[in-house]
Amino acid sequence: NQVFERCGYIDKSDHLFFDENEYNEAISKFPDIKSFIRLLIGGQEMLRGINKYALWITDEVYKTALQNDLIKNRVHLTKEIRKNNKPPYQFNKMKEAINTILVAPRVSSKNRDYLPIKFFDKNTAINDSVIAIFDPEEFIFGVVSSKMHMVWIRTVAGRLKEDYRYSSTLVYNTFPFPKITQTQKEKIEELVNIILDERDKDYLKTLAELY
């Protein structure tokens, strides 16, 4: 289960999305709709610290969500675009984590020494410009963000212009990482926490600035 997946929420309609101003205006006017909106993470959002949001409506809460006029209007506009292709209140694929999501950009600059990755909590949606592991073991962060993994990326990854295109099939699944003991995993996890602590010290900097 420790495999990166593409769970891209792709749609031609912008009506399911909110920029930061739209989000703040929406929850100010309708505080109750906050439970139907999630932070939306893509490559640029993750790397540059851009806040974008999306409606997250499961079948179980659909009727309740549509009692709100703002949501009802956005769903109606999306329905006009989608016609009868798929539900107008959901993305192409909706997968949820129990605790955390480990996210990596699908495209990363050739000038980076490490792949910039990040943990997000379970109340996060992702778009098609990233791939993710849902509920990973913490040591996976250390492996994927290591220098040796970056060497592998440079060797086997596809390219978008000159930048690296990270994929589960070509890069992650083929990475020749040996079986390790629980003690070794715990040591890697200690180092992961050191990295995360160092990031926290530079919390004003984006991942793009740090990497």
Region roles according to the model:
Residues 1-187:
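Polybasic, glycine- and aromatic-enriched phosphate-binding surface used to engage nucleic acids
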Residues 171-211:
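Extended amphipathic alpha-helical segments enriched in small hydrophobics
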